[in-house]
């Protein structure tokens, strides 16, 4: 069951994402070779989405997996052209779970601020 905070977060995310590009303009961007919307990434970082799963010690908000699922759901619904799932969710989760304190300090603060974009690999 979602808490009141989760519901507010979901509504905030949905509202922001509904203001972004339409499917037609996303298709045009993809066909032109654009792989990411830099202005959107900056906005996501400023709103704290890039630090959703990152501890406050490293500049994140540590809102937990339910909040991360709500973000993923909204991003999927909006077809957002962004590396936020691979960087802010998958990579930061792995580093937070398995990284040393030095690795966390180096990578997580940079991910939370939006300065570093990581990706995840699931095979070779």
Language-model features: where?
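Conserved "HGTGT" condensation-loop signature of ketosynthase/thiolase-family condensing enzymes
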Residues: 11
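Intrinsic disorder at enzyme termini
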Residues: 1-5
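Conserved alpha-helical interface elements of two-component signaling phosphotransfer modules
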Residues: 8
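Glycine-rich flavin
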Residues: 18, 22-124
């Amino acid at each position: 069951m979602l808490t009141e905070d989760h519901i507010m977060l979901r509504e905030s995310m949905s509202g922001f994402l509904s203001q972004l590009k339409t499917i037609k303009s996303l298709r045009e961007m993809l066909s032109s070779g654009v792989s990411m919307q830099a202005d959107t990434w900056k906005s996501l970082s400023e709103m704290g989405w890039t630090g959703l799963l990152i501890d406050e010690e490293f500049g994140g908000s540590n809102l937990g997996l339910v909040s991360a699922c709500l973000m993923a759901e909204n991003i999927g619904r909006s077809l957002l052209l962004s590396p936020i799932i691979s960087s802010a969710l998958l990579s930061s989760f792995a580093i937070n779970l398995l990284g040393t304190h030095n690795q966390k300090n180096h990578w997580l603060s940079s991910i939370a601020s939006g300065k570093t974009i990581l990706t995840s690999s699931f095979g070779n």
